[in-house]
């Protein structure tokens, strides 16, 4: 198995022009003409360290470059990170309850104590949710669309109220994780929770409640329910819609078009970008993927009038022999 370092790079990109005051002075007019108009970029550097408590329970330890044992969150800050991303699963009891709301609180408290910003990443599933699967939580199965909107809203508020009661104010909240194909739609899985594919390599959809292609209005309705729930607890939180393949402009127009045309709101667009796997999956070089993503960031920021953030990325940290 490849050695992989997964790092979350929060890059909040503010596209704007520098303000200039008018002047009748020729000298000032000359200086104004010579002034360079630059893009203003504010970076949040962070990591998704949601696994840290599970790793600690198994005896894993973390060390800085000097060989000093250091708690993982503190180590992230030592190396210049100023934000932490934490995923939330609804009922991960089949997976030892890691990433349930209580486990998230433990990690969020560490970040707060270090003065780091927190992003809460709702998966709205009992385990992993991504473009290939968005499995409906077991306790929500069989519910109607309206009932499931309430389930989603109540879960969102319950988790965020727990944060609030403990003095933690997330700066960002993801309503869904890589909802490229919607949210709250299920696929056939094995006992471990991994998707089972057909002979053509496609996942087998068993419930299409919030599938973006099959039920676009319901996908938008779920997102809107999550947005409103976040704002009820934290009115100033930045709500993110998170999609994968940040270089794919057609994908972003299609998915975000579903949301906006159905009245759903978002404050920020979050992107996943894995440039060093793009060649095998998408036939693009890493540079092509990165350049395409940067162009798409500028485009969607202007089109939808909001900031854009790379919320998920990853890269190899070692070669096949394990050499760093």
Per-region residue spans from a language model:
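Short, solvent-exposed loop/turn segments at secondary-structure boundaries
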Residues: 60-61, 95-99, 281-288
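Boundary/entry segment of secreted carbohydrate-active catalytic domains
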Residues: 35-75
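Sec-dependent signal peptide recognition
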Residues: 2-10
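Glycoside hydrolase catalytic-domain groove-lining segments
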Residues: 70-73, 77, 232-242, 246-323
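Short acidic, glycine/proline-rich loop/turn micro-motifs
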Residues: 57-60, 131-133, 185-188, 280-283, ...
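Bacterial Sec-dependent N-terminal signal peptides
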Residues: 13-38
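Substrate-binding cleft and catalytic face of glycoside hydrolase catalytic domains
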Residues: 74-196, 203-215, 219-238, 244
């Amino acid at each position: 198995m490849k050695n992989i370092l997964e790092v979350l790079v929060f890059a909040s990109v503010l596209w704007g022009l520098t303000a200039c005051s008018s002047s009748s002075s020729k000298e000032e007019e000359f200086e104004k003409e010579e002034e360079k108009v630059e893009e203003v970029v504010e970076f949040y550097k962070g990591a998704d360290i949601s696994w840290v408590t599970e790793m600690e329970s198994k005896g894993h330890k973390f060390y800085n470059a000097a060989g000093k044992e250091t708690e993982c969150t503190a180590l992230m800050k030592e190396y210049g990170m100023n934000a932490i991303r934490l995923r939330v699963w609804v009922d991960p009891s089949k997976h030892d309850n890691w990433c349930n709301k209580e486990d998230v609180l433990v990690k969020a408290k560490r970040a707060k104590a270090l003065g780091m910003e927190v992003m809460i990443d709702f998966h709205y599933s009992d385990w992993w949710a991504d473009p290939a699967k968005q499995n409906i939580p077991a306790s929500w199965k069989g519910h109607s669309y309206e009932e499931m909107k309430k389930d989603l809203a109540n879960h969102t508020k319950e988790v965020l109220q727990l944060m609030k009661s403990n003095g933690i104010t997330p700066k960002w909240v993801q309503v869904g994780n890589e909802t490229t194909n919607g949210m709250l739609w299920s696929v056939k899985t094995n006992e471990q929770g991994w998707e089972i594919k057909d002979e053509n390599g496609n996942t087998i959809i068993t419930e299409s409640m919030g599938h973006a292609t099959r039920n676009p209005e319901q996908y938008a309705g779920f997102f809107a329910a999550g947005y409103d729930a976040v704002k009820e607890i934290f009115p100033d939180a930045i709500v993110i819609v998170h999609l994968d393949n940040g270089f794919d402009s057609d994908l972003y127009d299609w998915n975000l078009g579903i949301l906006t045309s159905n009245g759903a709101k978002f404050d920020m667009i979050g992107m996943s970008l894995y440039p060093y796997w793009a060649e095998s999956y998408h036939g693009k070089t890493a540079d092509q993927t990165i350049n395409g993503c940067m162009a798409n960031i500028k485009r969607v920021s202007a089109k939808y009038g909001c900031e854009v953030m790379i919320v998920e990325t990853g890269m190899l940290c070692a070669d096949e022999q394990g050499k760093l």
